[in-house]
Amino acid sequence: DMILRKKDIHLLLLEDIQDPGNLGTMLRTGEGAGVTGVIMSKGCVDLYNPKVIRSTMGAIYRVPFLYTEDFYGIITKIKEICKVYAAHLKAKQYYDKYNYKAPTAILIGNESRGLKEETAALADILIKIPMLGKVESLNAAVAAALLMYEVYRQRRN
C-alpha cells in the first residue's frame, strides 16, 4: 500500500526476472530514473542474492520494493490508480508515442521468455522499442532502463 500511495507514481513491475545482475541493475537504474517502487513476482531472483545487492550500488536500501505471490492481483489494483504499459514484442506502437506524465507502471518480463500472455493481457497498453538490424529484443535491464528514463524525461520537462 505504501508504494501505491506515493505522489507522482512511477512503478516498475517485474515478472520472473532471473539474472541477479539484471535485477540489481534495474533497481539502481530505477532509483536514478525516479521510480517510486518496484513490484516483483514471486518468480524473480532473490533480492538479497549477493550479486543483486552489489549491482544495486545501495539502491536496494532506498527504493521501496515488494515481492508478491499475487502478481496479477497487484497489477489489477495498480490499474485502478495508474496506466500499465507492458514491454512486449507483439506491441503495435513504439514507447515514445505515449505520454507518461500521469501515474505510470512499466511491466517487464523474463529475460528469455518475456511476459506471460496472461500478464501482458492485464496491461493497458503494449509498447515496443524500435530496433535496427536483426536484433529482436534488448536485454531486460537495458529495455527497463530505456522505458524508465522516458518516463523521467517527460516528467522532468
Where are these regions (language model features)?
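Structured adenosyl-cofactor binding patch, chiefly the S-adenosyl-L-methionine
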Residues: 31-33, 47-61, 117-157
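Active-site/ligand-binding-proximal alpha/beta "capping" segment
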Residues: 85-135
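Generic alpha-helix initiation/capping and coil-helix boundary signal
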Residues: 23, 79, 116, 136-137
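RNA substrate-binding interface of SAM-dependent RNA methyltransferases
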Residues: 1-91
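Short, charged, surface-exposed secondary-structure boundary motifs
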Residues: 74-76, 95, 136-142
